[in-house]
Amino acid sequence: MPKSYTELYFPILLQAVIAMGLAAGLLTVSYLLGKKVRNRVKDMPYESGIVPTGDARHRFSVKFYLVGMLFILFDIEAIFLYPWVVVYRDLSRNGSLFGFYEMLTFVILILSGFFYIWKKGALDWGEPTARPGRK
């Protein structure tokens, strides 16, 4: 006999309540017991243990943004592979290779996009050098 949704999801709800309660409790104890000393050193921004110097308003090369966008693009495409991997056994159980060919097409499109941006030089950081076959 199947259990009700309340019985099925009660452990998850209990875990969430315990996690939030533990986090709130630890933050409260830290706030109540911690010292409240404010000085110039504590008010400085922390940057990997290095004392910050200069102004934070510098121009960044567009290549940083390009690489960031390409990373997000290919990362999301890699995330789309995960559900396919999970259900692949069910897709191929009846002997059909449709799911395999569908994902093979998807991977070929991803790789062709990757080779296209590589060929266009979107991943080159240095000054362009004279390479054979490249203008």
UniProtKB/Swiss-Prot annotation:
| Record's keyword annotation contains Lyase | no
Pfam families, sorted: Oxidored_q4
Alphabetized UniProt keyword annotations: Cell inner membrane, Cell membrane, Membrane, NAD, Quinone, Translocase, Transmembrane, Transmembrane helix, Transport, Ubiquinone
Question: Where's it found, cell-wise?
Answer: Cell inner membrane
* TM stretches of this protein: 9-29, 67-87, 97-117
Q: What is its EC number?
A: 7.1.1.-
Q: Which GO terms describe its cellular component?
A: NADH dehydrogenase complex; plasma membrane
The protein's topology relative to the membrane is:
Multi-pass membrane protein
Annotated Gene Ontology MF terms? NADH dehydrogenase (ubiquinone) activity; NADH:ubiquinone reductase (non-electrogenic) activity; quinone binding
Reaction catalysed by this enzyme: a quinone + NADH + 5 H(+)(in) = a quinol + NAD(+) + 4 H(+)(out)
Q: Which InterPro entries match?
A: NAD(P)H_OxRDtase_bac/plastid, NADH_UbQ/plastoQ_OxRdtase_su3, NDAH_ubi_oxred_su3_sf
Record-linked HAMAP family: NDH1_NuoA (MF_01394)
* Functional note: NDH-1 shuttles electrons from NADH, via FMN and iron-sulfur (Fe-S) centers, to quinones in the respiratory chain. The immediate electron acceptor for the enzyme in this species is believed to be ubiquinone. Couples the redox reaction to proton translocation (for every two electrons transferred, four hydrogen ions are translocated across the cytoplasmic membrane), and thus conserves the redox energy in a proton gradient.
Its assembly, as annotated, is: NDH-1 is composed of 14 different subunits. Subunits NuoA, H, J, K, L, M, N constitute the membrane sector of the complex.
The text of the family note is: Belongs to the complex I subunit 3 family.
Q: What is the name of this protein?
A: NADH-quinone oxidoreductase subunit A
Q: What is the lineage of its organism?
A: Bacteria, Pseudomonadati, Acidobacteriota, Terriglobia, Bryobacterales
Gene designation per UniProt? nuoA
